[in-house]
UniProtKB/Swiss-Prot annotation:
Location in or out of the cell: Cytoplasm
Signal sequence bounds: none
Organism: Shewanella sp. (strain ANA-3)
Pfam families, per database record: GIY-YIG, HHH_5, UVR, UvrC_RNaseH, UvrC_RNaseH_dom
GO terms, biological process: nucleotide-excision repair; SOS response
Name of the protein: UvrABC system protein C
Gene: uvrC
Protein role: The UvrABC repair system catalyzes the recognition and processing of DNA lesions. UvrC both incises the 5' and 3' sides of the lesion. The N-terminal half is responsible for the 3' incision and the C-terminal half is responsible for the 5' incision.
Cited SUPFAM superfamilies: C-terminal UvrC-binding domain of UvrB, GIY-YIG endonuclease, RuvA domain 2-like
Length: 609
């Protein structure tokens, strides 16, 4: 493919300074961002006669023009390169898609502080402990905290509405400060101990509790002493279960495995010498990318991504050495304004952690490769059965979900040769049809999916319809209309359930000829079809349930005379949810801002009647 780019003319004008270059294709999209100590030398290497790397050959064949930006130093070039990669997400760069904020445990500054899961901007006043590697680690820690410290985890609205202790008090997981079952001094002491524990100072917590136990026993307050004893025993069990290292302090330990185009970076987050959590990252790696670039690109983006709430330690241990390691250290140190070091040759505890991280990374890649090979085999078999001339690159499946015509939702799920492509999933809220009319729902969904479709759009090779011949005909009619002026159109296949609706008894129907066929119930190709069908059903039904619940919550209250959107919102926010509103007394309802005693009586009668 020739784009008309004159490399010789361009290279004559390029400086030998440090800087960053952006390569564009004929459409004006940035397809690659790189940095260099010597721009002329680096860019000249792309246009040698014999390019050994297949990826580089493909990249060069798509270059339409190149922009360069000079920098004062190679460190500045690294920082700018990272900014450009985040901005343009070029197709030939290794991309780390880590755009989720990290979760924390939040301790509020309320009179009776609460512990809670938090993700996102830290706007509320209080203390944030973390970040944790994932939501599961936070929930597990909160569950543990409930067993160790009787501190509330309910939200403030629920706390305000209590007139008697909740179930957590009966389970000894909360001291019920909402109804005065504990003094402020005792509650504050437990909050202080919980805070110390979350900071990793469990030995200090235990020693303080031992002192309190002995003091209570000396005062013959044996019941209180027994509670302290039980708390000490629970804390000691937790301390024994946690893997503790001598003097390792805070660091990230990264095991890397790269095979057959799949890279896994498995991180162990070591804080206060303990394994605080772990997380695997799978950056998008263009074909034929070498391990050096994968390593450099991942570390560059991971540790220079200012949009991510993450505490970055001073030390990182990684399983592989790479050429630009020291330049990357300098760039991160400058960006963070603190010392930052990357180590590869380590011993003792660090080596033990590194072996663990590397084992996890290797296992993760092997598992993904096994899954990828299985999916690939299923695609190949399906192509053979359908006698297709070209490989299937994209499949979509539509399903409709509703309850007796209520809150109808259509789903569209997408599979590529690696399996589900969840970023491309779509839901359609169906409006303006006769309730329960699945044909009209399918017509609306397919019409919206392919509205204004053109040759450059995302056209599926196969479009599955979860339904019988009637829905398939409607879908085929819409596709014929939308693709009448295009060279390519999807092959439609209906997936009709058998009489007993058991998996393996499905009938498959071609949309264009309406001929039907079946596959053996142990056919891998059928398993692929069942997978995409089941995924579309799951995605549709979860969307329908969410929409139905939202509609019912709204309609239940707004059907009461005098209750509009504002009062409904005030009731739900103040009391904590629809069930709490239904269970509230007239007096409790009247405490809600904007609700008079007469209105409270009306609401109470309507919901109880």
């Amino acid at each position: 493919m020739s784009t008309g780019f004159n490399a010789q003319s361009f290279l004559r004008m390029v400086s030998s300074s440090a800087g960053v270059y952006r390569m564009y294709d004929v459409k004006g999209d940035v397809i690659y961002v790189g940095k260099a100590k010597d721009l002329k030398k680096r860019l000249s290497s792309y246009f040698r006669k014999n390019l050994g790397n297949v990826k580089t050959q493909a990249l060069v064949s798509h270059i339409h023009h190149i922009d360069v930006t000079l920098t004062h130093s190679e460190t500045d070039a690294l920082l700018l390169e990272n900014d450009y990669i985040k901005q343009y997400m070029p197709k030939y760069n290794v991309l780390l898609r880590d755009d989720k904020s990290y979760p924390y445990i939040f301790l509020s500054q309320h009179e009776h502080p609460r512990l809670a899961y938090h993700r996102g901007p830290q706007r509320e006043k209080g203390y944030y402990f973390g970040p944790y590697p994932n939501g599961g680690a936070v929930r597990e820690s909160l569950h543990l905290m409930q067993k160790l410290f009787p501190i509330r985890q309910c939200d403030d609205l629920y706390y305000k509405s209590r007139t008697r202790p909740c179930l957590q008090y009966q389970l000894s997981r909360c001291s019920a400060p909402c109804v005065g079952k504990v003094s402020n001094a005792e509650y504050d002491e437990q909050v202080k101990l919980a805070s110390l524990f979350l900071k990793g100072k469990d030995k200090q917590v235990i020693s303080e509790l031992v002192a309190k136990m002995e003091e209570a026993a000396g005062q013959q307050a044996y019941e209180q002493a027994a509670r302290f004893r039980d708390q000490i025993m629970a804390l000691r069990r937790v301390a024994e279960q946690q893997e503790v290292s001598g003097n390792t302090g805070d660091m990230d330990v990264i095991g890397v495995h790269y095979a057959s185009g799949i890279a896994c970076f498995h991180l162990l987050f070591i804080r206060e010498g303990k394994i605080f959590g772990s997380r695997s990252y799978y950056p998008t790696v263009p074909a034929q990318t070498d391990i050096e670039e994968v390593l450099r690109s991942f570390l560059l983006q991971f540790y220079l991504n200012a949009d991510i709430q993450r505490t970055i330690p001073k030390e990182v241990v990684i399983s592989h050495h790479f050429e630009e390691l020291h330049e990357l250290e300098a760039a991160v140190s400058e960006a963070l304004n603190k010392k930052f070091s990357i180590k590869t040759n380590v011993r003792a505890d660090r080596a033990s952690f590194l072996r663990l991280a590397l084992t996890n990374a290797t296992n993760a890649v092997m598992t993904r490769l096994s899954h990828k090979n299985t999916v690939e085999q299923r695609f190949v078999l399906l192509e053979e059965i359908l006698e297709l001339n070209a490989p299937i690159q994209r499949m979509e499946c539509f399903d409709i979900s509703h309850t007796m015509g209520e809150s109808t939702v259509a789903s569209c799920v997408v599979f590529n040769r690696e399996g589900p492509h969840k970023a491309e999933y779509r839901r359609y809220n169906i409006e303006g049809i006769t309730p329960g009319d699945d044909y009209a729902a399918m017509k609306q969904a397919i019409s919206r999916r392919f509205d204004k479709i053109d040759a450059s759009g995302k056209i599926p090779d196969i479009l599955f319809i979860d339904g019988g011949l009637g829905q398939l005909r409607i879908a085929q009619q819409i596709v014929d209309e939308k693709f009448v002026n295009l060279d390519k159109a999807p092959q439609l296949i209906g997936v009709a359930k058998g009489e007993s609706r058991k998996p393996g008894l499905e009938t498959l129907i071609f949309g264009d000829t309406e001929t039907s066929f079946s596959l053996e119930d142990d056919s891998p190709a059928l398993h692929l079809i069942q997978h995409i069908r089941d995924e579309s059903h799951r995605f549709a039904i979860t969307g329908h349930r969410n929409r139905r619940q939202k509609t019912r919550n709204t309609s239940t209250l707004e059907s009461i005379p005098g209750i509009g959107p504002k009062r409904r919102k005030a009731l739900l926010q103040h009391l904590g949810g629809l069930q709490e509103v239904k269970g509230a007394s007239v007096a409790e309802l009247a405490k809600v801002p904007g609700i008079s005693i007469e209105m409270a009586q009306t609401i109470h009668d309507a919901l109880r009647g």
